[in-house]
C-alpha cells in the first residue's frame, strides 16, 4: 500500500494512492484530488517528496 503524506491547511494528512482521482503539476508541486469518504479532498506535495507512483500517475495523465 502506497500512501502520500502531505499538509493541508496546517494539518498533516495521509492518503492511499488508490483513492487519488486526478493529478496535475503546479510549478514544482504536484496537486491532486482524492476520494475522502464520499467527499472530494485536495492535496499537494512537492515534486521531490512525491512517491514515484504519484509521478507515474502524472505522466499517464499527460499534464507535465
UniProtKB/Swiss-Prot annotation:
Its main location: cytoplasm. Hyperthermostable. It is found in: Cytoplasm. The keyword Cytoplasm applies. InterPro entries: Chromo-like_dom_sf (IPR016197), DNA-bd_7a-e_arc (IPR003212). Highly stable from pH 0 to pH 12. Keywords: Cytoplasm, DNA-binding, Methylation. GO terms for cellular component: cytoplasm. SUPFAM superfamilies: Chromo domain-like (SSF54160). The keyword Hydrolase does not apply. One of its GO terms (molecular function) is RNA endonuclease activity. The modification N6-methyllysine is found at residues 5, 7. Can constrain negative DNA supercoils. May be involved in maintaining the integrity of the genome at high temperature. Monomer. Belongs to the 7 kDa DNA-binding/endoribonuclease P2 family. NCBIfam families: Sul7d. This is DNA-binding protein 7. It comes from Sulfurisphaera tokodaii (strain DSM 16993 / JCM 10545 / NBRC 100140 / 7).
